[in-house]
């Protein structure tokens, strides 16, 4: 049986499971040395690996929770103000859109835009949906669930984003 053994110099740390930050949503915030030379860590030592969760924890990934009583979405939108955000409910989906025009930051000028779309459970009471933005930039979208025999009231409507002065109580995974 022939087994091909590849030298660690030619391996990319975790391959497609560890994407480069170079062109992700943090474009313009500066780079880690790993972003410029991803093969360097395995060249120096085949046993050294960057933390898998370093980029995951700082990537703005949303968290969706659906328990027996309510449905909640947490989304890191620290670069956007409430005026830059639009939250709409279209039938069984919530659409979150953020856009700010070009502005100056520490690294030059930047403009950002994103679209997120989530399916709402069929038993979420759409007349009682709320959305708030915490002081640390965490958007919280929530709605109570109704008992399965009741109509949840599906329609199209905009949800206003209110600003909170305290940091979010969302877990920082």
Swiss-Prot record:
Lineage: Eukaryota, Metazoa, Chordata, Craniata, Vertebrata
Physiological role: Contributes to the transparency and refractive index of the lens. Acts as a chaperone, preventing aggregation of various proteins under a wide range of stress conditions. Required for the correct formation of lens intermediate filaments as part of a complex composed of BFSP1, BFSP2 and CRYAA.
Compositional bias annotation for Basic and acidic residues: 153-167
Family: Belongs to the small heat shock protein (HSP20) family.
Official protein name in the record: Alpha-crystallin A chain
Modification after translation, per record: Acetylation at Lys-70 may increase chaperone activity. Undergoes age-dependent proteolytical cleavage at the C-terminus.
Domain sHSP stretches: 52-162
Residues recorded with modification N-acetylmethionine: 1
Species in which this protein is naturally found: Meriones unguiculatus
Binding site for Zn(2+) 2: 107
Keywords carried by this UniProt record: Acetylation, Chaperone, Cytoplasm, Eye lens protein, Glycoprotein, Metal-binding, Methylation, Nucleus, Phosphoprotein, Zinc
GO biological process entries: lens development in camera-type eye; negative regulation of apoptotic process; protein refolding; response to heat
Subunit structure: Heteromer composed of three CRYAA and one CRYAB subunits. Inter-subunit bridging via zinc ions enhances stability, which is crucial as there is no protein turn over in the lens. Can also form homodimers and homotetramers (dimers of dimers) which serve as the building blocks of homooligomers. Within homooligomers, the zinc-binding motif is created from residues of 3 different molecules. His-100 and Glu-102 from one molecule are ligands of the zinc ion, and His-107 and His-154 residues from additional molecules complete the site with tetrahedral coordination geometry.
Modified residues (Deamidated asparagine): 101, 123
Deamidated glutamine modified-residue sites: 6, 50, 147
Region of interest called Required for complex formation with BFSP1 and BFSP2, as start-end residue ranges on this chain: 1-63
Major localization class: cytoplasm
């Amino acid at each position: 049986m022939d087994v091909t053994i590849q030298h660690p110099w030619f391996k990319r740390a975790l391959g497609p499971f560890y994407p480069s930050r170079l062109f992700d949503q943090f474009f313009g915030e500066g780079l880690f040395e790993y972003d410029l030379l991803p093969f360097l860590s395995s060249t120096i030592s085949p046993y050294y690996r960057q933390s898998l969760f370093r980029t995951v924890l700082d990537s703005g990934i949303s968290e969706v929770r659906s328990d027996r009583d309510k449905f909640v979405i947490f989304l890191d939108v620290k670069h956007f103000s409430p005026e830059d955000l639009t939250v709409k409910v279209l039938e069984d989906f919530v659409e979150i859109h953020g856009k700010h025009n070009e502005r100056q930051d520490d690294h030059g000028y930047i403009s950002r835009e994103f679209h997120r779309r989530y399916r709402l459970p069929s038993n979420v009471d759409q007349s009682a949906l709320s959305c708030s933005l915490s002081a640390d930039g965490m958007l919280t979208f929530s709605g109570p669930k109704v008992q399965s025999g009741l109509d949840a009231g599906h329609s199209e409507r905009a949800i206003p984003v209110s600003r909170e002065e305290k940091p979010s109580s969302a877990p920082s995974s």
